[in-house]
Amino acid sequence: MRSVTSLVSFSACLLASSVTAADTPLTVNGKKFYSQDIITRDVVVVGGGSSGCHIAVRLQDAGKSVVVVEKSARLGGHVATYTDPATRKTAEQGLVTFHNTTHVTDYLTRLDIPLAPISFSPSTNFDYDLRTGKPVNRTYNPTQEEFAAGFAGYSAQLAKYPQLNDGTFLPYPVPEDLTMPFGKFLEKYNLTGALMQMYNFNWGTGNFLTNPTVEQMRYWGANTVAAVTTGKFLVTARHNSSEIYTKVGNVLGATSSVLLNSEVTYTRRSEGKTGVQLIVKTPEGSKLLVAKKLVIAIPPKLDFVAPLDLSKTEKDLFGKYIDAGYYVGMVRNTGIPARTLITNSAQDTPYNLPVLPAVNIMNPTAIDGVWTVFSSSLQSKASFPWADDAVKADIIRSIKALQTANPDKFQQTEPEIIEWHSHAPYFLQVSSEEIKNGFYAKLYALQGLRNTHFTGAAWRVHDSSQIWKYTDTQVLPKLLAGL
C-alpha cells in the first residue's frame, strides 16, 4: 500500500528539496519515513565490491553525491587478504595482480596505494591426482617454444575482435569460432601450447574446455595476454590489496556515503526525472534512499537482484546465467615440504586437467607453514554450486590423500583451515546458444534504462583492472551525462 499522495510525487518533491518536515512522514511501500531516515543522493550504488567502490569514488570525485549499500560488514567483495597474527606477513585470497594501465594507476594513485612489479617466490611444482593422492606423469607438457607460439597464435585470433577489449561486444551473426568449445578452438588453430597457462590463470570458470570461446576471451583479452607472456603484472607494494578498500572506506566514509551490513528490501525504478527509491534494512533500522540514478554492482543472479524492481526483460536475461564456484582457503599443518606447489592433475583426462569439483592447486605463501588452496566447481544454475562445508572437507581429504599415498614425501599431520573465502557465484556466463541468440547485445542494451546502470564482473570479467576500464569508458560517461 502507498499513501494517498503518490510515491512518484513524493520522490519528485524529495529530489527537488531533499528535505521532508520531521513531523510529516513519507509512506513508501507501507513504511513511514521521517527526515532522519531519508537519504537523498545523486546516485545509489548497490554493492561495495571492486566495481561498486570504484564507481562510487569516481562519482564523488566528479562532484556527485553517492551512497553505497553493502550487504557484508566490509567493503572489497572478492578482495580478501590474510594477515598472519605472529609475523604480520600477508597472503592474498582474492585479487592479486593488476594490469599496468592508466585506469589502474590513476585510481590507485588517487587512493594513495603504491604499486610494484610482481615478483615470484621460488617453488617446485609437483603433479598429483588428489582423488587418490598418487603422482601424475604428465602427458601434456608444452615446451617454452610451444607456449610462446600458442599465445602468439591466440593473439592473432583475438585481433579479429578488437571490440572484446572493451566488453563482450560481438559482431552479428556471432562467428562460430566464438561459440565453439574453447578446447576445440585452441585445437583448431594449434594454440594448445597456451592451454595450461590459461587454465592456471583462470580457475573458477567451470569446465574450461567446454566453455564457449568468447567466455574465455572475456578474461583473455590483449592486456592479460601481454601481462602473462611478459610477466609484467603489478601488485600492491605493501602486499595488501585489502588496503585499497580501507582507503575507499575513508574516502566515502568522510561523506557518510557507506551503509554496511545493509540490504535492499524494496526498490522503485522509474524513467525520466522521477529517479529511483530504495528501502534499505540497516543496523540502525530501515532507511529510504532517494536518488536520480541507481548503479547495480552485484552479480545479476535472480536470487541476488530480486528486490531491485526488475523488468520482464531483466528477469528473462538474468535467469539465463549459470556460474561456477570458486573458493580459497588458507591452510596450515599440511605436511607439504616448504616451497612445494601441488597441482591437481589426472592421468586419464584431456591435458591432464583435474576432475571438478576439486582442489585446483596448493600454493605456498610468504608465511612459513601456510598454503593457499584454490578449489572450483563445474557450472551450475545455483548461485552456490558447492557448499562451503563440502569444499572444506574436500581440501582436508585431498591433503590426507597425499599424506597416505606418499608417506615418504609428506608428513602425517592434521591440516587446519585458518581462513576461508568463497567467491561464489563466480564467472557468470551463458551457453553458446544464448550467445548466438544475442544475449550480450540484449544485456548491454539495459544500460541506462529506468535510471539504472550496471557494472561488475558479469558485464566485463573477474578482473578489477578490466572492470575499472569498462566502468570508466562504458558506464561513467553516460551516467554522468544524465545527472
From Swiss-Prot:
Keywords: FAD, Flavoprotein, Glycoprotein, Oxidoreductase, Signal. Pathway: Secondary metabolite biosynthesis; terpenoid biosynthesis. GO terms for biological process: terpenoid biosynthetic process. Glycans are attached at N100, N137, N190, N240. GO terms for molecular function: oxidoreductase activity. Belongs to the beta-cyclopiazonate dehydrogenase family. FAD-dependent oxidoreductase; part of the gene cluster that mediates the biosynthesis of the sesterterpenes ophiobolins, fungal phytotoxins with potential anti-cancer activities. The first step of the pathway is performed by the sesterterpene synthase oblA that possesses both prenyl transferase and terpene cyclase activity, converting isopentenyl diphosphate and dimethylallyl diphosphate into geranylfarnesyl diphosphate (GFPP) and further converting GFPP into ophiobolin F, respectively. Other sesterterpenoids (C(25) terpenoids) are found as minor products of oblA. This is FAD-dependent oxidoreductase oblC. The lineage of its organism: Eukaryota, Fungi, Dikarya, Ascomycota, Pezizomycotina.
